[in-house]
Amino acid sequence: MIVPTSHEAMPNFNVLLEGAWLVRDIKTEDDAIGVAISEAGKRLNQKKMDFVEVEMGQWDCPECGDPLAGVFLVASTALVALLFEIKIFNAESEEHAGRIAKSTIGKALGAIPLRVLEIDTIG
């Protein structure tokens, strides 16, 4: 029988998720962004997840590649791109860290579509 001589620590990751937040009965893009960030923060804080950073995302123009504001407003309804950043400790792999992040944040936010954008290993 081979006995390991040392325990290798599992890596830690910084995970960035993108979410699509719908805001109804809104007049301006700025108001939609404020409401989306506020509502997301409130849901995260209710679950004691104030360690998750929330900010507005952006889209890239499919034609020219220039960044566009992460909000689309039509008929008093806005779709706001939000970014959620969380540190995941002791994950088995990048993929595992992404699944943990989506599950953890997804449970707090409810029916908000999430997608992993970026995963970085941290010290």
Q: What kind of feature is each model-predicted range?
A:
Residues I2-T5, A9-K27, I37, G41-F51, ...:
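Helix-coil modules at protein/domain termini and other flexible surface or pore-lining loops
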